[in-house]
């Protein structure tokens, strides 16, 4: 028995030393995340199209609460969550309970200054779009976790996101942070910036022009792309109606019977609003493709530059009559 116990002890001290060391550390250390600022998105001239706004997240640590009613009263006064919801979270026995995110920095600072035991206020970042709906279908937006959902925000998420940091604090057996023990901090790594070929001024003018056409023609939507033909750079990409990037879950059109529609129908309406039709749909090229067919005909020797044609306003192909946009025809061309 003694030999067995010695062998078991040696096994635990040598083979399982790292495991039990980590387990012991986990019992008296608490880790808090430090959010990394997301990379900015710029236009070609250095104008910021997507930025970060400092906000706060508010949590409670149950083991540190000295007066539950005081905690509930403070949070109810400063946060728009409702007393019943706040009370439910404050009285819940957990190591750390998140109460609210995206709290205005001024509000977070006010709560922190009250120094109520059990309430923790951490710095966070919220995505902010200074031009509202401008280029919304191109830029896309982020979710509550600051991760990209649609558009360039999700396409370049790994570049923009950065790496979160952390704060490690030492606690006693009850989970209360020890006041005189230095905390260990791992700094966050900010995300990389993204510079687009878009030109803010051209994008604004293109958006105004598209909105004017939509109103004049009573169209459901109007799309426009302005491109440099020499290198393919896109200076403007518009798909109106756009939506407010700072309130992406607010529909930009009326949905009949919105209160009675299903969640699935609401989600379909939102997805349709977020969709960039300039790149997600296919369209008949129309007259822009005439240069291709004309060049092919000249190259094949089917026609020459001196040939003329008569346009009666339609063309018979097999059993179909394909009409010209000018139904009376262009005559001799």
Per-range role (PLM):
Residues 40, 141, 287, 330-332:
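Gly/Ser/Thr-rich helix-start
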Residues 295-302:
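Alpha-helical support elements that line or immediately flank enzyme active sites
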Residues 274, 304-306, 310-333:
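Conserved catalytic neighborhood of penicillin-recognizing serine enzymes
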